[in-house]
Amino acid sequence: GILLLVLFLMSLVLFAPDLLGDPDNYTPANPLNTPPHIKPEWYFLFAYAILRSIPNKLGGVLALVSSILILILMPLLHTSKQRSMMFRPFSQCLFWILVADLLTLTWIGGQPVEYPFIIIGQLASVLYFFIILVLMPITSTIENNLLKW
C-alpha cells in the first residue's frame, strides 16, 4: 500500500508538477503592487496594518519597525512603583484599551485596502503609539501620586 502511494505521488511530482499548482504563480509580477491574496501571518497583522496606514512607503516602514521596537521601551515607560495592576484601576482600563486596539489592528491588517478600513487603521495606529508613549507614563505617575508612593 505504501509503495503504491509513494509511486503515485512521485509520478505526480515528477511527470506533472503543475497539475496541483496555483494559477497565481504564472501571472507576471508587479514590484509596485502587492497581490491581494498575500497577507502576513496572523501574529504580524497588527504591524502590517500600521505599515499600510501610512501612505508614504518610507514612513510606513519606519512606523512598522518602530511599532515592534517600541516594545523594547516598555520597561523604561513603566514608571509605576507598584508591580501589580490589582490596585491600579486606570492602568487596568488602559491595558484593556490597548488589547482592544491591538485586536482592531489585527483585524484591519487582514482586510483589503479600502475606504473605511484605511481610516480605522490610521486611527488605531495613532492610538497604539499614543497609549504606549504618552498615556502609560502619565497614568503611572498619576497612580503613584494617588497611592502616595
UniProtKB/Swiss-Prot annotation:
Listed transmembrane segments: 1-16, 58-78, 90-110, 117-137
> How does this protein lie in the membrane?
Multi-pass membrane protein
Sorted alphabetically, the Gene Ontology cellular component annotations on this record are: mitochondrial inner membrane
Highest rank taxon of the organism: Eukaryota
What is any Pfam family matched here?
Cytochrom_B_C
Q: What InterPro entries does the record point to?
A: Cyt_b/b6_C, Cyt_b/b6_C_sf, Cytb/b6-like_sf, Cytochrome_b_C_euk/bac
The cofactor binding remark recorded in the entry reads: Binds 2 heme groups non-covalently.
| Entry cofactors | heme
Alphabetical GO biological process terms: mitochondrial electron transport, ubiquinol to cytochrome c
UniProt keyword list: Electron transport, Heme, Iron, Membrane, Metal-binding, Mitochondrion, Mitochondrion inner membrane, Respiratory chain, Transmembrane, Transmembrane helix, Transport, Ubiquinone
One GO MF term on file is:
ubiquinol-cytochrome-c reductase activity
Q: How does it assemble?
A: The cytochrome bc1 complex contains 11 subunits: 3 respiratory subunits (MT-CYB, CYC1 and UQCRFS1), 2 core proteins (UQCRC1 and UQCRC2) and 6 low-molecular weight proteins (UQCRH/QCR6, UQCRB/QCR7, UQCRQ/QCR8, UQCR10/QCR9, UQCR11/QCR10 and a cleavage product of UQCRFS1). This cytochrome bc1 complex then forms a dimer.
Q: Which family does it belong to?
A: Belongs to the cytochrome b family.
Describe its function: Component of the ubiquinol-cytochrome c reductase complex (complex III or cytochrome b-c1 complex) that is part of the mitochondrial respiratory chain. The b-c1 complex mediates electron transfer from ubiquinol to cytochrome c. Contributes to the generation of a proton gradient across the mitochondrial membrane that is then used for ATP synthesis.
User: What is the recorded name of this protein?
Assistant: Cytochrome b
